[in-house]
Amino acid sequence: MKLDFLDFEQPIAELEAKIDELRHLDGQDMDLIKEVSALEQKSKNLTQSIFNRLSDVQVAQVARHPQRPYMLDYLKEMFTDFKEMHGDRAFADDAAIVGGLARINGQAVMVIGQEKGRDTKEKIRRNFGMPRPEGYRKALRLMKTAETFGLPVLTFIDTPGAYPGINAEERGQSEAIARNLIEMSELKVPVICTVIGEGGSGGALAIGVGDVTMMMQYSTYSVISPEGCASILWKDAANAADAASALGITAPRLKELGLVDEIVEEPLGGAHRNPSAAASSLKDAILRQLELLKNKPVDELLETRYQRYMQYGNFDVA
């Protein structure tokens, strides 16, 4: 697959183009092989250098990369025996939320996540990963099913936000989100939430309340997009970089604030460079967290979860 490079990756793109050009020449020339090897190392070093100093708004660009692995990609790489479950039993089946029963290393779990879609047809069908109320109600139905059978719940967050259309508001978008926050806080099974791309506001939180919150290294989590924030505060989306810095949207910043428990390392250059490696890292992290949670008594699980969220926003006054 040909990689799409972001604007700040253009020096890398030029090196990769040169490498591809040389690869199409006589592959038996030893000098040529050495030159390609040297350029590959140079590209790797340059990628490392650029990604070591990404600004917050550049991290947001990586989180939205069109080739970044989505929920269904992780599902195929990490799980077996997936059986999708459809509908909220009240209105419709929202394709922006995918969920169902699956196994991870043989252990039965309930998997739920937001899916953006790859091509135009899929993006439209999945509403670009922006769930409607019926999507969140479907997610809650699946969580309650998991609770009934004592299955851990694994959620994968990747949305610019809940769908803000009039029809969604008419069907109770805010109520659906609020209901999920309440119900997830009281689920009597382990809940592990992972931000794999964009974690956009209440649309992300509606499947983001759990015992453990993890973020992929180049994912983001925020109450509003940098562009949206800039449009409100500066009346100009061009100030997105300033907004991103002020919002503190990146995994390291959120872990520093105690809002995230673990950062899952991505391959050099981002998860889209090597989706299988990214999935392997995430799978290891989930299995590790499941091992820590699976034998906790229900009362202890709920109390720890409650205290975890009660600590949010605490600060000391000097």
UniProtKB/Swiss-Prot annotation:
GO molecular function: acetyl-CoA carboxylase activity; ATP binding; carboxyl- or carbamoyltransferase activity
Pathway: Lipid metabolism; malonyl-CoA biosynthesis; malonyl-CoA from acetyl-CoA: step 1/1
Protein keywords: ATP-binding, Cytoplasm, Fatty acid biosynthesis, Fatty acid metabolism, Lipid biosynthesis, Lipid metabolism, Nucleotide-binding, Transferase
Pfam families xref list: ACCA (PF03255)
Example of a GO cellular component annotation carried by this entry: acetyl-CoA carboxylase complex
Enzyme Commission code(s) on record: 2.1.3.15
Gene Ontology biological process terms from the UniProt entry: fatty acid biosynthetic process; malonyl-CoA biosynthetic process
Domain (CoA carboxyltransferase C-terminal) ranges: 31-292
Compartments reported by the entry: Cytoplasm
Main localization, broad class: cytoplasm
Catalytic activity entry: N(6)-carboxybiotinyl-L-lysyl-[protein] + acetyl-CoA = N(6)-biotinyl-L-lysyl-[protein] + malonyl-CoA
Entry superkingdom: Bacteria
Subunit structure: Acetyl-CoA carboxylase is a heterohexamer composed of biotin carboxyl carrier protein (AccB), biotin carboxylase (AccC) and two subunits each of ACCase subunit alpha (AccA) and ACCase subunit beta (AccD).
Family affiliation: Belongs to the AccA family.
Name recorded for this polypeptide: Acetyl-coenzyme A carboxylase carboxyl transferase subunit alpha
Record organism: Hydrogenovibrio crunogenus (strain DSM 25203 / XCL-2) (Thiomicrospira crunogena)
Classification lineage: Bacteria, Pseudomonadati, Pseudomonadota, Gammaproteobacteria, Thiotrichales
